[in-house]
């Protein structure tokens, strides 16, 4: 594998490996079947610290990419990369994110780039095709490569050797949740709804354009929607929004008639390093084993971590590394094997908040 087609890795027939990070080839927008989707990124920091030898940010390493630079990662990281498979070359588009000043910045830069690629390919497959009525041109499947590391290394796994998930894991979980809202950005911007749940779905979608810094909605619409079980539908074409500033985001919120939690989709029209993000002023509360987060302003990449007497391993959440709209209130269930500890919540461009946690406390 890959097998079939006019040449090896022909996206139009049989199966495809998504190595467009190192190869260029035609017909890749809606491949027939993705049998291996791969990008590379390090694991979470506490896992990385266990697998490398030496400093996590060696003296003299700046994070800058210059003409004479050999790698984007420090040598201590590269030693644990899958070098024979050119793992250091198979990153996502990290240059779309701000330069790194420290290890945490670089972990985010590489993780966010991988997560963005998972979302891009996952949404393409879920939508199926720009011409959904032509079944022969639909994408018909997707295998993430890979789900779990069987050896402590820096490569492509969504869950690392120590069973910790980082941005790629939660991106994968979101994009393949049964019900999906997503924006297709090609010759026009179209909002899609995908329903791979076990039942038909009715609801109301509010969608539009939001200025990141001011928090003001520039343009908005509301529409009743229906998505049959197993179907993907175009909710609307946003061409009538005409032009708008690239320091805005696209947003859509689905309120379901069956009472399930509202579904929120946020997407961008410019790369992250071109944008400025406000400090969101997060508020935290606990309702039993649910963490409730409220953002006063737009929040980029909310990151939830936990610690129990110095141990950062073993925490798991229903969602993590997500954006939030101004005024949004999000509930996240606390999973994992920890009975108590401290939860830390921060956005990528904001300060950190903490709250004490005891499992089962009301």
Predicted regions and their residues:
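Terminal connector regions
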Residues: 238-280, 337-362
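Long, low-complexity ectodomains and other extracytoplasmic segments of secretory-pathway proteins
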Residues: 165, 175-182, 186, 261-287
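Intrinsically disordered, low-complexity Pro/Gly/Ser/Thr-rich segments with frequent PxxP/GP/PP motifs
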Residues: 206-246, 312-338
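In a subset of proteins, long, contiguous C-terminal domains/tails are tracked
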Residues: 121, 138, 159-166, 175, ...
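Short acidic, flexible loop segments centered on an aromatic residue
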Residues: 197-215, 295-313
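Substrate-binding clefts and catalytic carboxylate motifs of secreted carbohydrate-active enzymes
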Residues: 17-201
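Short, well-ordered beta-strand segments enriched in hydrophobic/aromatic residues
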Residues: 189-193, 290-295
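Active-site neighborhood of glycoside hydrolase catalytic domains
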Residues: 1-3, 163
